[in-house]
Curated annotation (Swiss-Prot):
Active site annotation, chain numbering: S108 (phosphoserine intermediate)
Species name: Nitrosomonas eutropha (strain DSM 101675 / C91 / Nm57)
Statement: the UniProt record of this protein carries the keyword Phosphoprotein: yes
Gene3D superfamilies: Alpha-D-Glucose-1,6-Bisphosphate, subunit A, domain 3, Alpha-D-phosphohexomutase, C-terminal domain
Any single GO CC term annotated in Swiss-Prot or TrEMBL for this entry: cytosol
Cofactor note: Binds 1 Mg(2+) ion per subunit.
Uppermost EC category: isomerase
Binding site for Mg(2+): S108, D247, D249, D251
An example Gene Ontology biological process: UDP-N-acetylglucosamine biosynthetic process
Posttranslational mods: Activated by phosphorylation.
Reactions accelerated catalytically: alpha-D-glucosamine 1-phosphate = D-glucosamine 6-phosphate
Cofactor(s) listed: Mg(2+)
Protein name: Phosphoglucosamine mutase
């Protein structure tokens, strides 16, 4: 069954436009509350299910939180409120507090005028599809407020940042520290603004924190993991050893070397995997996505680490890790999942695993990545006016096959429809920049031509 509201990462959209409205969040809170009440938690007779609400630093977070809280309370579910808190912190606290669910009001790396929501199960992982469908079914029913004696209580959680800081530090070996390193931390004016710098500082680093002054509007604005040039400049300006950039909700990370070179999720996962293999603690292989650079796949093959590709989206990376019983997965955008450390992608914890590899080996980024030369990638977004079935179009298929033959084993072609916009993404990867440019343009042109022809034909 197709979901109506939930996408690959919860519900997201523009604030004030359905479904990112107070009215919908009130109904959503009530619907989630009813689903939680219908589950068998084996709670004591006088106990109700409890949900923790976290949010990032967007101005709209408080408005949506109030609506959501009212919905939960009306259904008869207890609520714990926190201040701005990274997404992975909510996932951790749900488990640590032994409560039934968590909700995060955030649109991750999007601008301030967008917002959204995602939920975590009692295990601290994203909700299964079946539960999201149950919630959507419940949304069709009107709100019937629980009797006053059964209304949910609302309390504010204390020292949530402190608990999470200690959890992050616990994933770094006790016998090591970050002394002697100068690290610039870009908090993206987001949910990590009171956390990321403190973690690095308490582990001994000399920390320069930037973009840790959220005003409700500046989240992700020319800063953080989606605008890495700012961090590159700051690392060079401060003469730092490294830079760490998270995104607005703290679930992804990119890093920068002292020379100002950017290392994406693919590179960071490679460093972590190689270090774990050397220490004999890499369990299984590594999961990447359809966007993972072919050079990384080939490098894993050379050093004997199994590698598998999932669809784009941290949910799919997580699912494939569980299926294979592997522990390390990543997207090039910086979502890195270390399943032995946390249930979900965590920017700070992932950065700490990389810093552990650097500290433990005494090597730097360039040393650990010397055996990987990234293949050039050319990405073209082709705008289409209506649903065009490119997968079953003969001309597109012929053009793609020709390109695949020309590129051979040292190239890759990926065509995929955007999940949010009327676009088809064409990605061609190979060793020769001119060759991939030629084929990317040719395939994109063919798709454009066929899409127009199919519109005219209708």
């Amino acid at each position: 069954m197709k979901k109506k509201y939930f996408g690959t990462d919860g519900i997201r959209g523009k604030v004030g436009e359905f479904p990112i409205t107070p009215e919908f969040f009130l109904r959503l809170g009530y619907a989630v509350g009813k689903v939680l009440l219908a589950s068998d938690w084996k709670l004591a007779a006088d106990k109700r299910p409890t949900i923790l609400i976290g949010k990032d630093t967007r101005i709209s977070g408080y408005m949506l939180e109030s609506a959501l809280e009212a919905g939960f309370s009306a259904a008869g579910v207890d609520v714990l409120l926190s201040g701005p808190l990274p997404t992975p912190a909510v996932a951790y606290l749900v488990r640590a507090l032994r409560i039934q669910a968590g909700a995060v009001i955030s649109a991750s790396h999007n601008p301030f005028y967008d917002n959204g929501i995602k939920f975590f199960s009692s295990e601290g992982s994203k909700l299964p599809d079946s539960m999201e469908l149950q919630i959507e079914a419940e949304l069709d029913f009107p709100i019937e407020t629980a009797p006053s004696i059964k209304l949910g209580r609302v309390q504010r959680l204390k020292d949530e940042e402190g608990r999470y800081i200690e959890f992050c530090k616990s994933t770094f070996p006790n016998q090591l520290d970050l002394r002697g390193w100068k690290i610039v931390v870009d908090c993206a004016n987001g949910a990590d603004y009171q956390v990321a710098g403190h973690v690095m500082h308490e582990l001994g680093a000399d920390v320069v924190t930037i973009h840790a002054n959220p005003d409700g509007f500046n989240i992700n604005h020319e800063c953080g993991a989606t605008h890495i040039m700012t961090l590159q400049g700051a690392v060079l300006q401060h003469g730092a050893d490294f830079g760490i950039a998270v995104d607005g909700d703290g679930d992804r990370v990119l890093m920068v070397s002292g020379e100002g070179v950017v290392y994406d999720g693919d590179s960071l996962a490679y460093i972590i995997a190689k270090h774990r293999q050397q220490r004999g603690v890499l369990q299984g292989g590594v999961v990447g996505t359809l966007m993972t650079n072919l050079a990384v796949e080939q490098a894993f093959e050379r050093i004997g680490i199994p590698f598998a590709r999932a669809n784009v989206g941290d949910r799919y990376v997580s699912e494939l890790l569980q299926q294979n019983d592997w522990y390390l997965g990543a997207e090039n955008s910086g979502h890195i999942i270390c399943r032995d450390k946390h249930t979900t992608g965590d920017g700070i914890i992932s950065a700490l695993q990389v810093l552990y590899a650097l500290r433990d080996t005494g090597l730097m980024f360039a040393d650990l990545m010397h055996d990987v030369t990234f293949f050039p990638q050319r990405l073209i977004n082709v705008k289409i006016s209506r649903d065009f079935d490119f997968q079953n179009d003969q001309a597109v298929e012929i053009c793609k096959n020709e390109a695949e033959q020309a590129l051979g084993n040292d190239g890759r072609i990926l065509l995929r429809a955007s999940g949010t916009e009327p676009l088809i993404r064409v990605m061609v990867e190979g060793k020769d920049p001119q060759q991939i440019e030629y084929w990317a343009e040719k395939i994109a042109g063919t798709i454009q031509q066929q899409a127009v022809a199919s519109t005219v034909g209708h």
